[in-house]
Amino acid sequence: KLRAEDGRSVKNVDISLFIKNLPDRRDTKRFCTEDASGSTSQAAGVVEAMESGAKIFLVDEDTSATNFMIRDELMQMVVHRDQEPITPFVERVRALYDEQGISTILVAGSSGAYFHVADRVIQMDCYVPKEVTKEAKEAAAGFGEGVQALKLTPVSFDRVPKKFKTGGRDERFKMKVLGRDSLQFDRDVVELRFVEQIADTEQIAALGYLLKYAGTHFI
């Protein structure tokens, strides 16, 4: 499940598939920040999911960065593509499936921009799903050619994780569960408040022990 995570840390992630030419000239091929915006955090989340081998993305419009998801025709007329650093997800979603086999399920209620590129459109009518693909495609056809579906550009996955420093003794490396919101490794805190799939602290503890084992045995 992907969402915007304002304020999250991003370490050496290639987000150039979606974001380039930032005003401060930061390198988006190896993007780093301790305080990501909604768009940069969601771009990083997509690339990290690709790197992990995910084959389906679950996206909710309500928890996404609008400027990452869409860019309408009027905005493109005022702010030219060459002046905008963000390539919206709607222009990459088709290629993610065609070239990488990654499907996307998007819940949306305010924009029909994805009707042009969707394989299926399902309407929820009083909690009952209805197939409305034909109607959505016909309606979208009346709004011109729709979005510009772009091919994917190469993404780098050559990050090298930093080895856990245990001083040769595994017991010296401390892992602590901080409620359902975070996990602490020595002095480093892993923020988990936006990972909605986590239901209890036992899951966080299991994740912590898995990371600790991987960090001390495989990295």
List each model region and its residues.
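Structural beta-strand/beta-sheet cores of well-ordered domains, especially the beta-sheet scaffolds
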Residues: 1, 32-35, 55, 100-104, ...
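Alpha-helical scaffold segments in soluble metabolic enzymes
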Residues: 45-48, 92-95, 206-210
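Conserved NTP phosphate-binding and transfer environment spanning the P-loop NTPase/kinase superfamily
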Residues: 98-101, 107-219
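P-loop NTPase switch/communication element
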Residues: 1-35, 70
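A glycine-rich, aromatic-flanked flexible loop/lid motif
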Residues: 15-19, 58-70, 175-182
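Conserved P-loop NTPase nucleotide-binding/switch module
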Residues: 49-93, 97-99, 110-137
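Conserved alpha-helical scaffold flanking the Walker A/P-loop in AAA+ ATPase domains
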Residues: 37-50
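Hydrophobic alpha-helical scaffolding
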Residues: 32-39, 79-86, 100, 104-108, ...
